[in-house]
From Swiss-Prot:
This is 5'-nucleotidase SurE. Its cofactor is a divalent metal cation. A divalent metal cation binds at D14, D15, S46, N104. HAMAP family: SurE. Nucleotidase that shows phosphatase activity on nucleoside 5'-monophosphates. The gene is surE. Keywords: Cytoplasm, Hydrolase, Metal-binding, Nucleotide-binding. It comes from Gloeothece citriformis (strain PCC 7424).
Length: 271
């Protein structure tokens, strides 16, 4: 598989440098002819959000034997966001054309994105003005990351041929089915996916208490009316349920425009 023009790609994840998802993604993109650099956490960092390491040093080293020889790979002691910052500042001599994060082992749908290290790594690329892609396989049991990796090859080829007017983050979720069983690709809006959670109390061998966060997904909750989201565009949660690959454009500006308007009308504050 070859491409029209090799691209410089930076890849990270939150599942760690040894995860099958990032290995499949990086190797597939390298075989497609791209220049691939991987900088990943040295261990599992799921659900770390957009955290940064500020009060201790970050250690990083080149790793060999995990990826195809044409892939340059680093492991980093920091968070996914640290990895992208470190790569852009200290590893790469050429600005990447795209930042990719994943392929995550598990979905990043709805409000998952607020906790996701996968999405946060991609968001870090966007903050630096680079169009970025977060990729997730919506299953914890499936090990077949190849369809998602193949889609990434096609997606960046399309983005290279038809650049977006402004940098954005594309949050991509891929259903855990064979390529021939996928319904297609849909542009979606972010859904609202919450969890019924509780902290399970346990005792260690010395009789001291500790807690595990446990819970179950509430798949879909109706969006509040005041958000005025376009009802004709399906949510990522809905479309994944119908076996579509979902693409949700995201930005880092979290301003609630309707809330701004509502507060303005209250006249609580002097003009």
């Amino acid at each position: 598989m070859t491409t029209e023009k090799p691209l410089n790609l930076l890849i990270s994840n939150d599942d760690g440098i040894f995860a099958l998802g990032v290995r499949t993604l990086a190797n597939t993109l390298a075989k497609a002819g791209h220049q691939v650099t991987v900088v990943c956490p040295d261990r599992e960092r799921s659900a770390t959000g957009h955290g940064l390491t500020l009060h201790q040093p970050i250690r990083a080293q080149i790793v060999e034997g995990i990826f195809d020889p044409q892939v340059t790979a680093w492991s980093c002691s920091g968070t996914p966001s640290d990895c992208i910052k470190f790569a852009l500042s200290a590893v790469l001599f050429t600005r990447p054309d795209f930042v990719l994060s994943g392929i995550n082992h598990g979905s990043n749908l709805g409000t998952d994105i607020l906790y996701s290290g996968t999405v946060s790594a991609a968001m870090e690329g966007l903050i630096d003005g680079i169009t970025s892609i977060a990729l997730s396989l919506t299953s914890f049991s499936s090990q077949d990351f190849q369809p998602a990796a193949n889609f990434a090859v096609d997606l960046i080829a399309k983005l290279a041929r038809h650049p977006l007017p402004q940098p954005t983050l594309l949050n991509v979720n891929v259903p855990p089915v064979k390529s021939e069983d996928m319904a297609g690709v849909k542009l979606t809006r972010q859904g609202l996916r919450r969890y019924r959670e509780n902290f399970e109390k346990r005792l260690d061998p010395r009789g001291k208490s500790y807690y595990w966060l446990v819970g179950e997904v509430i798949e879909e909750i109706e969006q509040p009316d005041h958000l005025h989201l376009p009802g004709h565009i399906p949510t990522d949660v809905q479309a994944i349920g119908d076996n579509y690959i979902t693409i949700t454009p995201l930005q880092y500006n979290l301003t609630d425009v309707q809330g701004f308007s509502d507060l303005n009308q209250t006249q609580w504050f002097d003009p």
